[in-house]
């Protein structure tokens, strides 16, 4: 039961990190270009 919850939270965390990095990366690149 506990390991199942850990797997779900870990997968959701990695998915959130991917989405956030995809959103932040273009903004950072724009700031560097400017």
UniProtKB/Swiss-Prot annotation:
<protein>
    <recommendedName>
        <fullName>Uncharacterized protein YDR371C-A</fullName>
    </recommendedName>
</protein>
């Amino acid at each position: 039961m506990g390991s199942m919850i850990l797997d779900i939270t870990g997968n959701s965390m990695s998915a959130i990190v991917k989405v956030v990095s995809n959103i932040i990366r273009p903004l950072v690149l724009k700031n560097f270009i400017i």
